Design a protein with these regions (language model features):
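Short proline/glycine-enriched turn/loop motifs at strand-loop junctions of beta-rich domains
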Residues: 104, 114-119, 160-161
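Short, surface-exposed beta-strand/strand-loop-strand elements in extracellular ectodomains
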Residues: 117-130
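N-terminal prepro-regions of secreted/extracellular proteins
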Residues: 1-89
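Noncatalytic modules at the cell exterior or secretory-pathway interfaces
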Residues: 105-107, 145-160
Length: 173
């Protein structure tokens, strides 16, 4: 029976992907060791209010069919950093212009969301088109590590039934 138990622990260990985080150790996609609960890898079956400003990142798989999508029209193109001041109507997605970034670098996105208590999906779009996001409200900041080289952009999606404002900044390093 000891061998079976040891084998079970070994199997669990091999299935666990541990990432050190400033807030402690967190297991992505398996069990969150610090909170003793499951952390989903994508946002298909979550309540966004449970993950606001937690620093937990998701693959953003929610459909955006029917959403209006608009690329920022500022003069800044291919910039490694930029400020933005966006007013996002309901069911709306806004993106920055594309910029080139190298794998092993990071994109940090931060800002302020108003009105108070409104939640936005804020994230990056990878060169392959995969969206990665956090759920944010109020003042927030998040660092997205990169594992691909190519064109990226920053985005925000408003799933609320009213206009939500996002004033912020992104930077790469």
């Amino acid at each position: 029976s000891t061998g079976i138990l040891a084998g079970g622990y070994r199997a669990l260990y091999e299935l666990t992907d541990v990432e050190k985080d400033e807030a402690g150790i967190q297991v992505l996609g398996d069990i969150n060791v610090t909170a003793d609960n499951t952390v989903p890898q994508d946002n298909s079956n979550i309540n966004p209010e449970d993950y606001v400003n937690t620093g937990i990142e998701f693959i953003d798989v929610l459909p955006i069919d029917g959403y209006v999508s608009e690329k920022d029209q500022s003069d800044i193109e291919l910039a490694a950093s930029a400020n933005f001041d966006w007013s996002l109507p309901s069911d709306f997605m806004r993106t920055t212009k594309d910029f080139w970034e190298t794998s092993s670098h990071h994109i940090t996105v931060g800002g302020t969301i108003t009105p108070t208590g409104k939640i936005l999906r804020v994230g990056i779009i990878e060169p392959s088109g995969i969206r990665r996001c956090i759920y944010a409200t109020g003042n927030f900041s998040y660092n997205f590590p990169l594992d691909k080289t190519g064109f990226y952009c920053v985005y925000a999606i408003n799933d609320n039934s009213e206009v939500v404002n996002l004033t912020g900044h992104y930077g790469t390093y």
